[in-house]
Amino acid sequence: MTDFQYATDQDTIAAQATAPGRGGVGIIRLSGPKSLAIAKQIIGFEPKPRYAHYVPFKTTGQEQLDEGIALYFPGPNSFTGEDVFELQGHGGPVIMDMLLSHCVALGARLARPGEFSERAFMNDKMDLTQAEAIADLIDSTSEQAAKCALRSLQGAFSKRVDELVEALIHLRIYVEAAIDFPEEEIDFIGDGKVAAELAGIQAKLAEVLKEANQGALIREGMNVVIAGRPNAGKSSLLNALSGKESAIVTNIEGTTRDVLREHIHLDGMPLHIIDTAGLRDSPDEVERIGIQRAWDEISKADRILMMVDSQSIDSKDPNEIWPEFMEKLGDTKHLTLVRNKVDLTKEGTGIETVSGVPVVSLSAKTGEGVTDLTEHLKAVMGFDSTTEGGFIARRRHIEALNKANRFLDAGNEQLHGYGAGELLAEDLKEAQQALSEITGAFTSDDLLGRIFGSFCIGK
């Protein structure tokens, strides 16, 4: 038995389940084998299961610490699957500390971050995606993110993954039976059954991957860096996108010397906009530091908006406009050229592609064409705001789905290219394990520790 499992099986844990600070109500939560014994010492009697008792909370010396509601949920019919006891008192930090300290003195220990959800997972009350959805629901920054996290908590994502795993198990049984019992003369390579089922699984996996990418965008959003020479209108575009005066706008070059950040939502997708210092050779040490930070942000961006002043530049080819920038940037797959100030040139707004780079013409000052840009940003990230019934997803989920797909691609090659049944069976097994990592059916203790360690203490 690992240390991870031992702590889960033996200890009674306690933590404040409500946010730290002052509030009308504060909750202390316990889970584990000593919960009932601790409950009896604090309220003076054995609580009725799933019943709200309004009682004083006392020490063993009968000193009253607070009064409020006491709730007892005997396992396995509780959130964690263990005996759970809650004290719902007044939400002052001193009162919460007194109650929590008393619970520890009576035999509980302080819970690790996410340990209540961890125990729920270990006791099969939920799978890993549902446990993660609790944290995502708490941390959601938009209505759409909250709805998607709730659907994941209710099992929408898990169901899709479980269906894929079941299909793989069914296919593995057929393939491995043909290998292990050659006397049955099952020609799984020639009969087309395996090929058809494998194609069906990959098609369903592609659908889940598309939905998961949507869920990851809703959860994490995209980082958009606005870059360009001084006075190209970068700060004006930041203000236009954020809908407020986030940055100072003047005609003086070098006004923006550091990185400015704003966070908005585009139809539910978080957009992290980063305005940077104008890129140029500068004798000013402070400005040079800002320019280096700008390049640091460019290297990490999901999308780079290269801002140019359309008054001084006729070309729409980024290689002609700024060859030095393009050479330093290298890969242009994340680049969009933004031609600003079209209200002055009267050239019109819109989107086109030049030398493989999208070009958006707009006016950050008047707002003309800004909607074209926001629609473009959603499109390049593959975000579909019309999708209904989606679920929340994380980067690790995307990686696991892609990993499973790579094994299925390899299995396809073994089937059609070499007729290698044993190698196909191994690839199917690896794909199944990759998918099982998502729900936690096949997951290392180290990964579990990292996931639950990112949770709130009382969750």
From Swiss-Prot:
Instruction: Write out the entry's keywords from A to Z.
Output: Cytoplasm, GTP-binding, Hydrolase, Magnesium, Metal-binding, Nucleotide-binding, Potassium, tRNA processing
List the subcellular locations: Cytoplasm
What organism does the record attribute this protein to?
A: Marinomonas sp. (strain MWYL1)
Give the protein's recorded name.
tRNA modification GTPase MnmE
Q: Which InterPro entries match?
A: G_TrmE, GTP-bd, GTP-bd_TrmE_N, GTPase_MnmE, MnmE_dom2, MnmE_helical, P-loop_NTPase, Small_GTP-bd
Record GO terms (molecular function): GTP binding; GTPase activity; metal ion binding
| Quaternary organization | Homodimer. Heterotetramer of two MnmE and two MnmG subunits.
Residues annotated for Mg(2+) binding in this entry: S235, T256
> Do you know which Gene3D superfamilies this protein is assigned to?
P-loop containing nucleotide triphosphate hydrolases, Probable tRNA modification gtpase trme, domain 1, tRNA modification GTPase MnmE domain 2
Superkingdom of source: Bacteria
Q: Name one GO cellular component term.
A: cytosol
Give the E.C. number(s): 3.6.-.-
Family stated for the protein in its record: Belongs to the TRAFAC class TrmE-Era-EngA-EngB-Septin-like GTPase superfamily. TrmE GTPase family.
> What cofactor does its activity depend on?
K(+)
UniProt-listed GO biological process terms = tRNA methylation; tRNA wobble uridine modification
Q: Where does GTP bind?
A: 231-236, 250-256, 275-278
The role this protein plays is: Exhibits a very high intrinsic GTPase hydrolysis rate. Involved in the addition of a carboxymethylaminomethyl (cmnm) group at the wobble position (U34) of certain tRNAs, forming tRNA-cmnm(5)s(2)U34.
SUPFAM superfamilies recorded: P-loop containing nucleoside triphosphate hydrolases, TrmE connector domain
Which enzyme class? hydrolase
Xref: Pfam families: MMR_HSR1, MnmE_helical, TrmE_N
Q: Which residues form the TrmE-type G domain?
A: 221-382
* Protein residues bound to (6S)-5-formyl-5,6,7,8-tetrahydrofolate: R29, E86, K125, K459
